[in-house]
Structures are given as C-alpha cells and as structure tokens.
Amino acid sequence: MKFIFMGTPEFSVPILERLNELGDVALVVSQEDKRKGRGKKFTKTPVKVKAEELGLEVFQPGDINSKEAIDKLREVQADIIVVVAYGQILTQEIIDLPEKYIVNVHASLLPYLRGAAPINRAIMEGHDKTGVSLMKVERGLDAGPVSSVREIEIGDMNAGELEDK
C-alpha cells in the first residue's frame, strides 16, 4: 500500500511514525518552513524534521492546490492519503487523486470543533471531553463520514498535555 502523508505540527508526528512502520510512505507533505525567533531563522516543521530522520521525501508547497503541487501528488500514484493537521483545505481534485481514498485524523469529536485549533477551542469553550476522530475526506471543512472516535476527558489538562494523549 502506497501512502502520501500530509501533516505539519507535533501532533502529526506519532501518526507519521506509525504509518511509516506499517507501509510505504512515498511522500510527506508539510507546510513551508517559517521564520521564528529573534534571528528570524527558518525553522522546519516537526513533521519535516521527523520525515528527514526517517529518510522520507518531503514536499512543502506554498499552495497545495496549485497545479505544480497537484502534479507532484499525482506522480506518486498513492493508494491512500493520510491527513493530520496539515493546515490547508484540499480541493476536490486532490480528494479524487488517491486510488482508494483520503483519511483525516482530526483532534476533536466531530462534528464538533471543525477547523483549526480544536484542542485549544475545547479547553477555551469549557468542554468536559474532547477526542480524536478518523474520517474519510469529502468536500468541505472536516466533512465526511466519521469511522472511528476516541474520547478523552479534559480534566485539568492543558493543550500540550491533551496533544500528547
């Protein structure tokens, strides 16, 4: 089974590691490196750092929906694309690329807290629990059928502690 993995933050890294153990990760797609700190040095995304450690090819398009990016993804001829906190909305053209489907791992109990920063929003909104949802990607923001959910009690955990769960 040939995979494309799309992710950016630390939350995505354990899933990339596990996917790499299970199959052929042909391409890792992450957001562009950003300037950070006082020196404004370019800092690699956590997913890029891990992908390089694993010897995987990394692709960092500014716009995942550009012709060049879509052509690159098409070249891979992936069976499945796995998306974990990638950070850009995918067009139908990308959704239709893999042989089988695209799955998204989202850090909330969908349909609640769609979109960015769901862990932080769960805490700020005073939710008792949150979780992780596995869903098939369809057109729309975190839309598509949810196939699996894991609930986590928030308690007195902060966002970093919840991400680690």
Where are these regions (language model features)?
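Residues that cap or flank secondary-structure elements
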Residues: 7, 38-39, 61, 111
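Residues at alpha-helix termini
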Residues: 21, 53, 75, 124-125
